[in-house]
């Protein structure tokens, strides 16, 4: 599945036996539910049985739950959406979420895929949510990134 210029096709992944956590916000439910659906389709096609799914209200809550998931999962997928408003709040939330997820990933040595959309408009978010007519499926892309990175790390850690 390719969404546009420069977007690679999603790889075929076999993550059988991998413990995967997904944290998804509920704000802008149509978008977040679609992102979650895309991620779940990828985990299912990669033979991940029963990923742990945790829902939180907003994007700012995602990093702390991702941190808890990273403690006992091999891959974490973070999903949500922040849409620019008329105040600087957008910038603060986007920065906090991005830095928080990066810190969790590095501190836990666990891939945490950032599937939190940061858009100027709701239309841009809908176009990336994996809905019918959307140009991209960022939930699926985040899941593929988390799983493929976890497999890469398994390979690196398995070397003597």
Curated annotation (Swiss-Prot):
Involved pathway(s): Cofactor biosynthesis; riboflavin biosynthesis; riboflavin from 2-hydroxy-3-oxobutyl phosphate and 5-amino-6-(D-ribitylamino)uracil: step 1/2
Pfam families xref list: DMRL_synthase
UniProt keyword Transferase present: yes
Active-site residues (renumbered): 89 (proton donor)
Gene3D superfamilies membership: Lumazine/riboflavin synthase
Protein's recorded name: 6,7-dimethyl-8-ribityllumazine synthase
Gene name of this polypeptide: ribH
GO annotation, biological process: riboflavin biosynthetic process
Positions annotated to bind 5-amino-6-(D-ribitylamino)uracil: 27, 59-61, 81-83, 114
Cystine pairs: none
GO cellular component terms given for this protein: cytosol; riboflavin synthase complex
Family: Belongs to the DMRL synthase family.
Alphabetical keyword list: Riboflavin biosynthesis, Transferase
GO molecular function terms noted in the UniProt entry: 6,7-dimethyl-8-ribityllumazine synthase activity
Functional summary from the UniProt entry: Catalyzes the formation of 6,7-dimethyl-8-ribityllumazine by condensation of 5-amino-6-(D-ribitylamino)uracil with 3,4-dihydroxy-2-butanone 4-phosphate. This is the penultimate step in the biosynthesis of riboflavin.
HAMAP family associated with the record: Lumazine_synth
EC number: 2.5.1.78
InterPro entries, per database record: LS (IPR034964), LS/RS (IPR002180), LS/RS_sf (IPR036467)
């Amino acid at each position: 599945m390719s969404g546009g210029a420069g977007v690679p096709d999603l790889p075929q992944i076999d993550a059988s036996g991998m413990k995967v956590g997904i944290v998804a916000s509920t704000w802008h439910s149509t978008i977040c539910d679609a992102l979650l659906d895309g991620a779940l389709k990828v985990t299912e096609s990669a033979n991940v049985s029963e990923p742990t799914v945790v829902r939180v209200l907003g994007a700012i809550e995602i990093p702390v739950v991702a941190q808890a998931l990273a403690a006992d999962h091999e891959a974490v997928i973070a999903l949500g959406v922040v849409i620019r408003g008329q105040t600087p709040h957008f910038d603060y939330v986007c920065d906090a979420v991005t830095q928080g997820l990066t810190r969790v990933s590095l501190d836990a040595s666990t891939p945490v895929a950032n599937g939190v959309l940061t858009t100027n408009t709701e239309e841009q978010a809908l176009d990336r949510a994996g809905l019918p007519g959307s140009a991209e499926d960022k939930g699926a892309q985040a899941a593929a990134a988390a799983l493929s990175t976890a497999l890469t790390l398994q390979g690196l850690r398995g070397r003597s």
